[in-house]
UniProtKB/Swiss-Prot annotation:
Record-annotated active site: 375 (nucleophile)
Superkingdom of this protein's organism: Bacteria
Transmembrane segments: none
EC nos: 2.1.1.176
Protein name (database record): Ribosomal RNA small subunit methyltransferase B
Length: 429
């Protein structure tokens, strides 16, 4: 039996690591969840995701409720108060229980002398809640985004930025990809129905299913046998543009964690696929996905800017470049992105993307297809990136996939329930 731990203090420490140390929640949370019971795993995730989704609100409230911010070794208490505020505002946890557990969290982080302070701040919020929230809802902090990102979204999407922000602040739906080598989508949906769950097919992407209610993967029919994979609908759209064929040599660049690698092999089981990623640790997830689905691909660690180091002079029929990006299209899935990214990251990422595009283009066969994809909504990484590439690359031709005013297709967050995503399909003359 696992030792009873204070979930509020664990959440506060995790959030502190994200905000103060720039660590990714997807790296921090799983090891913490291993330390708690199954029933507590979901609550720990809810507290971490929820506070990060609404961070600017709790920051704003604490500044109103406290004369001085908590600093130094007491900084964790700041995040513990955030966890308390989130419970009072957004969960069905009874207020007395939320307060008691949060105050007790001070003992777990070895700050028992601050229990009275935490209790006082949270009770003061309860007394002034209506007045404080009215003031908050009239401020820019209500958008729950950092100001630099808000400015970029307003500039790029003067008519749509508010709906993008709203979508980013929602909980995401759970999308699945049915493995067509095992079942048709309709036959798997029938199995899902037999298991007492409901799913809905995507109108455009033939393997995509949205669950009515998110569920643990082990509850999904045939998950362990590789019948289905968790993957957002927008990410599945890459295969529509790539259109892999049996017998082709296909490169999946920046491939981890392997969702698109395995999708290529579901669509074209006899394709020769090379999956490459710069992050050796994340490549372990590519191997795991291939193993679960019973598929084979060549997997290599490598930097996309220097392809000759990992593929020599090899030429490919098709290349999928899921480029490193700001991930501003998947904030609803990874709310820590709002606080991990900085404005200065965008030009640096755009430069890296252009270097990878230029380097990999020489490894595409004449007549071959390259699909450039990102999970960003920022034009500098997407339409402007492709415009610049077309201007400097004489043998590159764009396949029309989107609206006339931009090369490529930009999906915005929440459109057809999918993530924000960009695709451009290029043919080598």
């Amino acid at each position: 039996m696992k030792k009873q731990r204070n979930l509020r203090s664990m959440a506060a420490q995790a959030i502190e690591q994200v905000v103060e140390q720039g660590q990714s929640l997807s790296n921090i949370l799983p090891p913490l969840q291993q330390k708690v019971s199954d029933k507590d795993k979901a609550l720990l995730q809810e507290l971490c995701f929820g506070v990060l989704r609404t961070l600017s609100q709790s920051d704003w409230l604490i500044n109103k409720l406290m004369a001085r911010p908590m600093t130094g070794k007491q900084r964790t208490v700041h995040y513990l108060i955030m966890v308390g505020l989130y419970q009072l505002l957004y969960t069905r946890i009874p207020p007395h229980a939320a307060l008691a557990e949060t105050v007790e969290g001070a003992v777990a982080i070895k700050r028992p002398q601050l229990k009275g302070l935490i209790n006082g701040v949270l009770r003061q919020f309860q007394r002034q809640q209506d007045e404080l929230l009215a003031e908050f809802n009239a401020s820019d902090a209500r958008y729950l985004h950092p100001s630099w990102l808000l400015k970029r979204l307003q500039k790029a999407y003067p008519e749509q930025w508010q709906s993008i922000v709203e979508a980013n602040n929602q909980r995401p739906p759970m999308w699945l990809r049915v493995n067509r080598t095992h079942h048709s989508r309709d036959s798997w949906l029938a199995l899902l129905d037999e298991a007492g769950m409901k799913g809905f097919p995507h109108a455009d992407y033939p393997d995509a299913v949205q669950l009515e209610t998110p569920a643990p993967v082990h509850a999904l029919p045939g998950f362990e046998e590789g019948w289905v994979t968790v993957q957002d609908a927008s990410a599945q759209g890459c295969m529509t543009w790539l259109a892999p064929q049996n017998g082709e040599h296909i490169l999946d660049l920046c491939a981890a964690p392997g969702g698109k690698t395995t999708h290529i092999l579901e669509v074209a089981p006899e394709a020769q696929v090379l999956a490459v990623d710069i992050d050796e640790q994340r490549l372990s997830r590519v191997y795991d996905n291939l193993k679960r689905l019973g598929m084979k691909a060549t997997v290599k660690q490598g930097d996309g800017r220097y392809p000759s180091q990992w593929c020599g002079e090899q030429q490919f029929d098709r290349i999928l470049l899921d480029a490193p990006c700001s991930a501003t299209g998947v904030i609803r899935r990874h709310p820590d992105i709002k606080w991990l990214r900085r404005d200065r990251d965008i030009p640096e990422l755009a430069q890296l993307q252009s270097e990878i595009l230029d380097a990999i283009w020489s490894h595409l066969k004449s007549g071959g297809t390259l699909v450039y994809a990102t999970c960003s909504v920022l034009p500098e990484e997407n339409s402007l990136q492709i415009k610049a590439f077309l201007q400097r690359t004489a043998d590159a031709e764009l396949c029309e996939t989107g609206t006339p005013e931009q090369p490529g297709k930009q999906n915005l967050p929440g459109a057809e329930e999918g993530d924000g995503f960009f695709y451009a399909k290029l043919i080598k003359k």
